[in-house]
Amino acid sequence: MFYHLILMLAVLDPSVGIQTQQVAAANQPTHFTNYAAAYREAQQAKKPLLVILNPADESSAVKVEEVRNTQQRRDLLQKFVVVVIDTSTDHGETVNKLFNEKSLPHVSVIDRDQQWQLFRTSKKLQGEDWNRVLETFQNGEQTARLNLDVKLPCFT
């Protein structure tokens, strides 16, 4: 399956979809809108790839700005290459087919060698969920595991 994903990258136009964040904070990561460009950047930088597949309905879409709303997450996101795909476009439809995902929005983490999908969910991620995902997969190691259905103990 993943071999087909790599094969399809050759079909996608890598010259489209690099969207740099023009913000005051220089420490924010580059945000890609083209999967092929993000894939190549992650491969070159040896960083895990955080893929967000968004639906056409913006009200249910994952908003990267909201994910970045804490310093902890901004710091963690620097360890990833982030790509946000609008699945209502031709490019987005193609990428969504590669992931074979019917439930949107969808979040996936690809390892730092771009060979394995380490994590995937269509669950609506809240603040602590994002913290756990980003902390667990920040090194892009294939041995990392996370089950968001397991609640962490709260010591009082």
Predicted regions and their residues:
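Positively charged n-region of N-terminal signal peptides that target proteins for export
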Residues: M1-H4
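N-terminal leader/targeting and pre-domain segments
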Residues: L7-L9, D13-A45, D129-R132, T136-F155
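Thiol-based oxidoreductase modules, predominantly thioredoxin-like and allied folds used
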Residues: A26-T33, L53-A56, R73-G92
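Typically the conserved alpha-helix immediately C-terminal to a functionally engaged Cys/Sec
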Residues: Y35, S60-L76
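Short active-site neighborhood of thiol/selenol oxidoreductases, capturing the structured segment around
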Residues: A45-S59
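Solvent-exposed loop/turn segments at secondary-structure junctions
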Residues: A56-S59, T87-H91, Q114-W116, K124-G127
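Non-catalytic, surface beta->alpha helical segment in thiol-disulfide oxidoreductase systems
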Residues: V67-R68, K102-L146
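Structural alpha/beta surface segment adjacent to cysteine/selenocysteine redox centers
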Residues: T94-K102
